[in-house]
């Protein structure tokens, strides 16, 4: 039971990390804004992969 909670939280946070930049991209729709959000998402993914080990 204890493993299920953190796993759900991680999935939720991952979804937020993926959805937030895409929503901001839809709102701004400028090529200059697309790059920073993708870089930020990439940094977050590396942080998540490091923390999981």
Swiss-Prot record:
Induction: Accumulates upon infection by generalist herbivores such as Spodoptera littoralis. A motif (SCOOP motif) lies at residues 37-53. It is found in: Cell membrane; Secreted, Extracellular space, Apoplast. Keywords: Apoplast, Cell membrane, Cleavage on pair of basic residues, Membrane, Secreted, Signal. GO terms for cellular component: apoplast; plasma membrane. It comes from the Eukaryota. Residues 1-26 form the signal peptide. One of its GO terms (biological process) is response to wounding. GO terms for molecular function: LRR domain binding; receptor serine/threonine kinase binding. A motif (SxS motif essential for MIK2 binding) lies at residues 49-51. Its main location: membrane. Belongs to the serine rich endogenous peptide (SCOOP) phytocytokine family. Interacts with MIK2 (via extracellular leucine-rich repeat domain); this interaction triggers the formation of complex between MIK2 and the BAK1/SERK3 and SERK4 coreceptors, and subsequent BAK1 activation by phosphorylation. Brassicaceae-specific phytocytokine (plant endogenous peptide released into the apoplast) perceived by MIK2 in a BAK1/SERK3 and SERK4 coreceptors-dependent manner, that modulates various physiological and antimicrobial processes including growth prevention and reactive oxygen species (ROS) response regulation. This is Serine rich endogenous peptide 3. It comes from Arabidopsis thaliana (Mouse-ear cress). The lineage of its organism: Eukaryota, Viridiplantae, Streptophyta, Embryophyta, Tracheophyta. The gene is PROSCOOP3.
């Amino acid at each position: 039971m204890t493993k299920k909670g953190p796993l759900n939280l991680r999935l939720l946070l991952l979804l937020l990390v993926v959805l937030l930049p895409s929503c901001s991209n839809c709102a701004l729709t400028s090529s200059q804004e697309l790059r920073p959000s993708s870089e930020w998402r990439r940094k977050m993914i590396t942080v998540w992969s490091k923390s999981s080990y």
